[in-house]
């Protein structure tokens, strides 16, 4: 198992020193979903939610969240993001909204947390916008799908869970 880099020799939490690492192009993709009732999904699809365009607002919320990750996750480095894409789409078969975020930077550390935060906040935004009509919504399957760049290279999730999260 890999060493926990956010702990010092005494086991105390610390922000990792990345000063000596080279700047490289980094990419991370994360996914998640919000399961809801069929009639709630229909409201979203038809643009009839009382609070407005759920898909557009969730997209923007995810982008904003990626940019503010270091303010939310205590040991994350503030990063100069070069690209953030958040896609929110309806899935009629599974009665859910699927969320995917792709985040890029040229930096000394990865953007996995930014991608995961984008998905989580987009999902929470969906819940906030629709809770008046469907308090039973479920947010789940928030996971890293892929990361590239840096010393550890490329990693991709290859299990069934990732395929089902699409």
Swiss-Prot record:
Q: What is its EC number?
A: 4.6.1.17
- Annotated residues for binding of substrate: 75-77, 113-114
Catalytic class of the enzyme? lyase
Pathways per UniProt = Cofactor biosynthesis; molybdopterin biosynthesis
Q: Name one Pfam family in it.
A: MoaC
Which catalytic reaction applies to this protein?
(8S)-3',8-cyclo-7,8-dihydroguanosine 5'-triphosphate = cyclic pyranopterin phosphate + diphosphate
Signal sequence region: none
A GO molecular-function annotation: cyclic pyranopterin monophosphate synthase activity
What does the similarity note say? Answer: Belongs to the MoaC family.
| Function description | Catalyzes the conversion of (8S)-3',8-cyclo-7,8-dihydroguanosine 5'-triphosphate to cyclic pyranopterin monophosphate (cPMP).
Q: What is this protein called?
A: Cyclic pyranopterin monophosphate synthase
- Name the source organism: Thermomicrobium roseum (strain ATCC 27502 / DSM 5159 / P-2)
